[in-house]
């Protein structure tokens, strides 16, 4: 039976190639061909018959068809009009056709409809903005099961002190619970990518954390510019101080509050870091609670990062 499935997948892929459709690596078009990987991804998403599923980059529809068989509806977002047409043709005149909605265009620019789950073999070049578009979407979805480049996936789950721990790690973990599900080798794709892949499960925190994400992202962006430097050294950088001073003066102006006569942004920032016992800390070893406390201290003093 597995041989029949494999032959069917190969035939569909070959039919696409015979029609002159060349897979575009600029769009990250590496088609997932292993049905066992697809089955595992669907199982880990706990897909229900009542679910609306969002898929980004459906390609030739190997995973799309499997989801259509189980879900109430699949919304497939595809930037390549050729593949979008092939996907629609694949389910044409079948019971699956009414359950498929194809959105043609750039996912990052699209206005997302309601969905319960997101399951996708993600175009790797849009991985980071894709994650935050999903996690900042409202209403919250239940979970996402996504295929990423392996190193990117490892960054998502990295903890303070890990070599790969970075701004991506802490920003994602602020908004969601992140779990590594499995590794997927290059030979599971056609054409095979140059890198290894991994599947990750994201479950948005509900309720969301009580923090302005724009402010949070501004703080972590500065802190992780040089994650091995102390915060005291990082916040002495001229461009950082100029940005914070501009924001501070605007904030005071909007509140009709005068600027202190002896005001110096560097002194104010260092004073806050020392009060929080964080002047000697480095971003590489700081967790979510550390950054929450630091952001609250800065904001309470009128220092903003947006």
From Swiss-Prot:
For this chain, one GO molecular function annotation is:
RNA binding
- What Gene Ontology cellular component terms go with this record? nucleolus; small-subunit processome
Any GO BP annotation: rRNA methylation
Q: EC?
A: 2.1.1.183
| Superkingdom in the source lineage | Eukaryota
Write the record's keywords in alphabetical order, separated by commas.
Methyltransferase, Nucleus, RNA-binding, rRNA processing, S-adenosyl-L-methionine, Transferase
Q: Quaternary structure?
A: Part of the small subunit (SSU) processome, composed of more than 70 proteins and the RNA chaperone small nucleolar RNA (snoRNA) U3.
**Full protein name:** Probable dimethyladenosine transferase
Give the organism, scientific name: Drosophila melanogaster
Taxonomic classification: Eukaryota, Metazoa, Ecdysozoa, Arthropoda, Hexapoda
């Amino acid at each position: 039976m597995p041989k029949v499935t494999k032959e069917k997948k190969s035939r569909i892929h070959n039919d696409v190639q015979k029609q002159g459709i060349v897979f575009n690596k600029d769009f990250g078009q590496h088609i997932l061909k292993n049905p066992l990987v697809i089955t595992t991804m669907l199982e880990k998403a706990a897909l229900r018959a009542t679910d609306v599923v969002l898929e980004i980059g459906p390609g030739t529809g190997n995973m799309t068809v499997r989801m259509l068989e189980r879900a109430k509806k699949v919304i497939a977002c595809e930037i390549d009009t050729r593949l979008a047409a092939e996907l629609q043709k694949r389910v044409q005149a079948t019971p699956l056709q009414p359950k498929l909605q194809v959105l043609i265009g750039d996912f990052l620019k699209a206005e997302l409809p309601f969905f319960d789950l997101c399951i996708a073999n993600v175009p790797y070049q849009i991985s980071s903005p894709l994650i935050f578009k999903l996690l900042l979407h409202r209403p919250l979805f239940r979970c996402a099961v996504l295929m990423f480049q392996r190193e990117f996936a490892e960054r998502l789950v990295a903890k303070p002190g890990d070599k790969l721990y970075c701004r991506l790690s802490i920003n994602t973990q602020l908004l969601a619970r992140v779990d590594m599900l499995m590794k997927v080798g290059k030979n599971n794709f056609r054409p095979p990518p140059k890198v290894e892949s991994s599947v990750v499960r994201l479950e948005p925190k509900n309720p969301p954390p009580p923090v302005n994400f724009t402010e949070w992202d501004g703080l972590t962006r500065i802190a992780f510019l040089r994650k091995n430097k102390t915060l005291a050294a990082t916040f002495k950088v001229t461009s950082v101080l100029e940005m914070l001073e501009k924001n501070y003066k605007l904030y005071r102006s909007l509140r009709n509050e005068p600027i202190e006569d002896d005001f110096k942004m560097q002194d104010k920032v260092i004073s806050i870091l020392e009060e929080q016992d964080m002047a000697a800390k480095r971003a590489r070893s700081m967790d979510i609670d550390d950054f929450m406390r630091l952001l609250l201290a800065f904001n309470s003093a009128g220092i903003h990062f947006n």
